Amino acid sequence: VLSPADKTNVKATWDKIGGHAGEYGGEALERTFTAFPTTKTYFPHFDLSHGSAQVKAHGKKVADALTTAVAHMDDLPGALSALSDLHAHKLRVDPVNFKLLSHCLLVTLACHHPADFTPAVHASLDKFFSAVSTVLTSKYR
């Protein structure tokens, strides 16, 4: 459960990210494919090379979904219901991949905003990404 302090940290961090969210989403997705090659199996139709326009575009979709989640932290299940259905029923993404991408998102944000990435902010973002992952995998059961 996200505390009021967690929500404040997440919103403040997302505000600082601003227009870079799509760029960071693409970078985190590319990092995920590099660090965890098994995640590539869900994207056989993508050019997965460094700097790929397809990876960047999908990373922007990830970032846009997270921006929606930040705006609706008090109702993540409602805000992410359609994405949960898509990933559970149509795409059948292995739930572990959300944890892997979350880790790569944390690394990417820490690289770009080291001064802002305090232990408290790290913990809040980790809890937030975990909450988003839980919602996205909730319809698997």
Swiss-Prot record:
<dbReference type="InterPro" id="IPR009050">
    <property type="entry name" value="Globin-like_sf"/>
</dbReference>
<keyword id="KW-0813">Transport</keyword>
<feature type="modified residue" description="N6-succinyllysine">
    <location>
        <position position="7"/>
    </location>
</feature>
<dbReference type="InterPro" id="IPR000971">
    <property type="entry name" value="Globin"/>
</dbReference>
<feature type="modified residue" description="Phosphothreonine">
    <location>
        <position position="108"/>
    </location>
</feature>
<protein>
    <recommendedName>
        <fullName>Hemoglobin subunit alpha</fullName>
    </recommendedName>
</protein>
<dbReference type="GO" id="GO:0020037">
    <property type="term" value="F:heme binding"/>
</dbReference>
<keyword id="KW-0007">Acetylation</keyword>
<feature type="modified residue" description="Phosphoserine">
    <location>
        <position position="102"/>
    </location>
</feature>
<dbReference type="InterPro" id="IPR050056">
    <property type="entry name" value="Hemoglobin_oxygen_transport"/>
</dbReference>
<feature type="modified residue" description="Phosphotyrosine">
    <location>
        <position position="24"/>
    </location>
</feature>
<feature type="modified residue" description="N6-succinyllysine">
    <location>
        <position position="11"/>
    </location>
</feature>
<feature type="modified residue" description="Phosphoserine">
    <location>
        <position position="138"/>
    </location>
</feature>
<dbReference type="GO" id="GO:0005833">
    <property type="term" value="C:hemoglobin complex"/>
</dbReference>
<dbReference type="InterPro" id="IPR002339">
    <property type="entry name" value="Hemoglobin_pi"/>
</dbReference>
<comment type="similarity">
    <text>Belongs to the globin family.</text>
</comment>
<feature type="modified residue" description="N6-succinyllysine; alternate">
    <location>
        <position position="16"/>
    </location>
</feature>
<comment type="subunit">
    <text>Heterotetramer of two alpha chains and two beta chains.</text>
</comment>
<feature type="domain" description="Globin">
    <location>
        <begin position="1"/>
        <end position="141"/>
    </location>
</feature>
<dbReference type="GO" id="GO:0019825">
    <property type="term" value="F:oxygen binding"/>
</dbReference>
<keyword id="KW-0349">Heme</keyword>
<dbReference type="Pfam" id="PF00042">
    <property type="entry name" value="Globin"/>
</dbReference>
<dbReference type="InterPro" id="IPR012292">
    <property type="entry name" value="Globin/Proto"/>
</dbReference>
<feature type="binding site" description="proximal binding residue">
    <location>
        <position position="87"/>
    </location>
    <ligand>
        <name>heme b</name>
    </ligand>
</feature>
<dbReference type="GO" id="GO:0031720">
    <property type="term" value="F:haptoglobin binding"/>
</dbReference>
<dbReference type="GO" id="GO:0043177">
    <property type="term" value="F:organic acid binding"/>
</dbReference>
<dbReference type="GO" id="GO:0005344">
    <property type="term" value="F:oxygen carrier activity"/>
</dbReference>
<feature type="modified residue" description="Phosphothreonine">
    <location>
        <position position="134"/>
    </location>
</feature>
<keyword id="KW-0561">Oxygen transport</keyword>
<comment type="function">
    <text>Involved in oxygen transport from the lung to the various peripheral tissues.</text>
</comment>
<feature type="modified residue" description="Phosphoserine">
    <location>
        <position position="124"/>
    </location>
</feature>
<dbReference type="InterPro" id="IPR002338">
    <property type="entry name" value="Hemoglobin_a-typ"/>
</dbReference>
<dbReference type="GO" id="GO:0042744">
    <property type="term" value="P:hydrogen peroxide catabolic process"/>
</dbReference>
<feature type="modified residue" description="Phosphoserine">
    <location>
        <position position="49"/>
    </location>
</feature>
<dbReference type="GO" id="GO:0004601">
    <property type="term" value="F:peroxidase activity"/>
</dbReference>
<feature type="modified residue" description="N6-acetyllysine; alternate">
    <location>
        <position position="16"/>
    </location>
</feature>
<dbReference type="GO" id="GO:0031838">
    <property type="term" value="C:haptoglobin-hemoglobin complex"/>
</dbReference>
<keyword id="KW-0597">Phosphoprotein</keyword>
<feature type="modified residue" description="Phosphothreonine">
    <location>
        <position position="137"/>
    </location>
</feature>
<keyword id="KW-0479">Metal-binding</keyword>
<feature type="binding site">
    <location>
        <position position="58"/>
    </location>
    <ligand>
        <name>O2</name>
    </ligand>
</feature>
<feature type="modified residue" description="Phosphothreonine">
    <location>
        <position position="8"/>
    </location>
</feature>
